[in-house]
Amino acid sequence: MPPDSLRLYGFARKYPAKTMMTTPFEDFLKQHDEESWSATLTTLLRSIHEVDRNATQIWFSFYPLSLFLALEHADDPETLAQRLLLQGKYYLKDQIDSSHTFLYGHRYWPEVKAAVQKYAREFSASFNRTLADQILAVAKHVAGQAKLDEALVIGITAIAFMTIRQVGLAAFEAAPGQVLIDKKHARKSPAEVLRERAVDDSQGFLSFLKTIDKKWTVTYDENDDGGKYRLNHLQDLAWGAAEDRSRNWRELDPRRVEGPIPVECRSASCGTCWVGVLGGAEKLSDVAAREGKKIKEFGYIETVEARPLIRLACQAQAQGAVSIVIPPWNGVFGKYLKSRVNS
């Protein structure tokens, strides 16, 4: 299933683009609302490599078009951001190269970025292909040039298209287009990444007799050997992270008051601790009533899935090793967007 955040209340329909000089490609992208992007992603997911299938959905949940449009068309975006309790880096324009480092396809970002830029500049309104078909065409071109599996660059190509939608082609072209992970991690194969995500911690001799004292590893940055911590069986992700004192977390991100996962309340009241689950979603507890209700109010996801890819870390309890990604921002915007559409 595509990320439900793409379906956020049809917000794009309510706000036509502001008048400005744009390219035909940008005009084409502006014709597509959340529903259209959701359908596009559904089509693409069938072709995206397993290593990036979850990651691509998570990225689109982290950077919803509806929130961008709300801010873009607000009379005073800064005041609206304060009203929606937005904290951290929520604009894609500030992280064109870095927002997708958790995708395997990020390794091919320079090639993808160059190809998308060229395609955008040569785009004509007479092109009669769907958004999904155009993304697939660019990905196929990149794969052919780089001699790699096309499935590895479909997700990152879709991200490039959405990034242009939110930042504009000129800003996209101005970004350096750098790979922001080290060579050691960049050399890993998709199979290696998937294998590491699937491994559970050994519990030692006679582990089958253990019930309470099992411990699991939570990886929060697959591109950092130290980007992980251990927690107890059935301990929630946020509580386990609080015991990680390996770094000065506040210095890295003021939202991180203790541990790598930003927290405030620990009771699903603030929305600070949301995370995406790259691997091991099935090894987390089911979404309980409160988490399901609050995560919709925050605006992060609309779903009835028992174990979705977007979770509140203070509610999700570990039953095995998992790999997560921590978004660089948080807010409370679900009710606002819904009220604007219904008004």
Predicted regions and their residues:
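Short flanking/linker segments adjacent to small metal-binding domains or redox-active Cys/His motifs
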Residues: 187-219, 225, 308-343
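Local cysteine-cluster metal-coordination motifs and their immediate loop/turn environment
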Residues: 259-283, 304-319
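Long, compositionally biased, glycine/small-hydrophobic-enriched stretches that function as flexible linkers
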Residues: 6, 10-11, 15-198
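Aromatic- and Lys/Arg-enriched surface recognition patch
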Residues: 294-308
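Generic detector of contiguous secondary-structure segments
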Residues: 207-226, 256-269, 273
